């Protein structure tokens, strides 16, 4: 799956993820429904109008698997960030609905700072949100990946040299971006979790009993 700015709904998660096209050959298909399953064999043949060798198709397939691996890594990273953002939104709503005291004010301040950090990390991947009109953001991971993705999928032969260079660049960008995500999670978010342990949010206020004489 491609990285997503927000947590996917249950309905979205139920959709089957797509992948690269298979190379020509014989394959076994397994269909399952509940406890029942059945198998069948199919043979995939390539478009005879396209002059490309099996060797080049295999090289292309191997290359595209490396491309998809970067998608998987970034999807895993953004999914973690989305879960943190979901938690922040829930906690902010909870704090806003309670009586404000000094401890809650500090928690709210920390939550807003964490949310700002999440937004900054999101921009590294997706860029600025809700931009009207045509606006390129070449510094983002998504822009660089799309350049590689569309160029690679439109080439049906052996990967070109410029595609190899772009893959190397997106690997480095994926590594550096996920490293920043990891630092935020291990330092900022875990630090906030420890702060909550030491300064728990009181979900209810003590209510005195009615004096009855």
Which residue stretches match the model-derived regions?
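Short acidic/polar micro-motifs centered on Gly/Asp/Asn
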Residues: 1, 34-35
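Glycine-centered tight-turn motifs at strand-turn-strand junctions
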Residues: 1-18
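Extended hydrophobic-aromatic, low-complexity segments
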Residues: 3-7, 38-41, 51-54, 134
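A glycine-anchored, Pro-Gly-centered beta-turn/N-cap motif
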Residues: 18-26, 36
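Mature extracytoplasmic or organellar-lumen-exposed domains after removal of signal/transit peptides
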Residues: 26, 33, 40-42, 76-213
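Low-complexity, Pro/Ser/Thr- and charge-rich linker/hinge segments at domain boundaries
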Residues: 41-73
């Amino acid at each position: 799956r491609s990285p997503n700015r927000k947590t996917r709904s249950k309905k979205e998660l139920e959709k089957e993820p797509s992948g690269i096209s298979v190379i020509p050959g014989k394959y076994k298909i397994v269909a399952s429904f509940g406890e029942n399953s059945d198998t069948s064999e199919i043979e995939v043949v390539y478009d005879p109008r396209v002059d490309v060798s099996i060797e080049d198709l295999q090289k292309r397939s191997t290359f595209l698997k490396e491309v998809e691996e970067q998608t998987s890594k970034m999807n895993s990273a953004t999914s973690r960030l989305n879960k943190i953002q979901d938690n922040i939104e829930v906690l902010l709503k909870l704090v806003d609905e309670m009586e404000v005291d000094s401890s809650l004010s500090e928690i709210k301040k920390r939550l807003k700072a964490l949310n700002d950090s999440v937004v900054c990390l999101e921009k590294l991947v997706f860029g600025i949100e809700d931009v009207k009109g045509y606006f390129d953001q070449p510094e983002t991971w998504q822009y660089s990946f799309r350049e590689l993705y569309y160029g690679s999928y439109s080439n049906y032969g052996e990967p070109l040299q410029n595609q190899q260079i772009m893959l190397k660049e997106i690997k480095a960008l994926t590594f550096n971006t996920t490293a920043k995500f990891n630092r935020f999670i291990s330092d900022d978010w875990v630090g906030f979790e420890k702060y909550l342990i030491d300064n728990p949010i009181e979900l209810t206020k003590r209510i005195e009993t009615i004096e009855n004489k």
